[in-house]
Amino acid sequence: MILLMLFGYVSSFVNWAFCTVVTPILAMQLSKQIKGLHFPMMIAAGYSTMILGQCLGPSASVFALVATEGHFLQDKIGILTQDQTVYNGVNVTLFTIIAIFTVILSILTVPPQDEVVEFKKEFDDDVEEEIELENTIADKLNGSKIIMYLIGIAGAIVIILTFVEKGILGSLSVNFIIFLFMTINCFLYNSPRKFVDAYKENMVLTTEVVIQFPFYGGLMGMITNSGFGAVIVQAIVNVATTTSMPVWAYISASLTNLFIPSQGGQWIVQGPLLVEAAQQLNANIIHIIDAFVYGDEATNLLQPLYVIPALSVVGMKLKDVWGFMAFIWVFWLILTTLGFYFIPMIV
């Protein structure tokens, strides 16, 4: 369990979608080799690492967005680099506490041996299908390693120059992270054809997510245009203080995420309102942003949208893991609210 969760945290720092898929695969392989592991808890614990890892990872939408020049709130909060928003003392301390507690909780939450559900489903290895290329210039280019390497080298040069100019943390904007992964893929796939085929294969895992997003987009529009988001934030301002504002930002983000499970889309709705509330109360805007991210991520344990690809990989259903996910969320709620209230007083 410890190995699985450490792997989950590290892979989440790389990219949340990457972690969502590879962590259940590792859980599956570990369960094949080690008897007596409760597989539903392995999946729930691994998924929780993806969620929590985003609170200290460079690929979280809001952290990357507010570090991007020209973002829509720049005139109010400026550009906040990730060494300010992600790697500050309060955030690192809170993340460490929750991460350690989650590992301990996952280890201790083991059912009696007669109730353990082991992984049983066998997966056949996919046989790689050889594609016969036609003897044309276009098909030769589609199967060419040189094309991918040339694009990859050009991308690597741009990445290095950006790091030199802005520093590593200062470079981590939304556009840069997308560009970084595209460049890495140029070296991982040795032909354009294999890259496109891999992309098409993995799109199968996202089908249910893609179908649901238009509906959540509609909910986002209703919340925005109806003024419901403004009502929530105004209610917070009425009861919050400078010290408790991060806690209320966390709670409001958690509630809104149940209806808008998209961190970037949710920030578009709540960001301006939370910034305005923070300025009215003279609260620390960085702590507000951190609390928003924690709140958005926490209820992903209750909102099942992003666990669907993971369940598809291992052939499980939501009912098999949701109880464990909700159990972890309860403890996160307690730790995070206490953390955002007391840790800023100490660190």
Task: Describe each model-derived feature in a short phrase.
Residues M1-S11, G36-S59, K76-D83, T243-N257, ...:
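Alpha-helical transmembrane segments of multi-pass membrane proteins
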Residues M1-K32, E165-C186:
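Alpha-helical transmembrane segments and their immediate interhelical/interface regions
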Residues L26-V116, Y306-G339:
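Membrane-core helix-loop-helix motifs of multi-pass transport proteins
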Residues Y9-W16, T20, P24, M50, ...:
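Transmembrane alpha-helical segments of multi-pass membrane transport proteins and ion-pumping complexes
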Residues M28-K35, D197-E208, Q234-N238, V275-Q279, ...:
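Short amphipathic alpha-helical coupling elements at transmembrane boundaries
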Residues M1-L26, I211-S226, V237-E276, Q280-L281, ...:
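Hydrophobic alpha-helical transmembrane segments of multi-pass integral membrane proteins
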Residues Y87-I100, I104-E208, Q212, F327-V330, ...:
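Hydrophobic transmembrane alpha-helices of multi-pass small-molecule transporters
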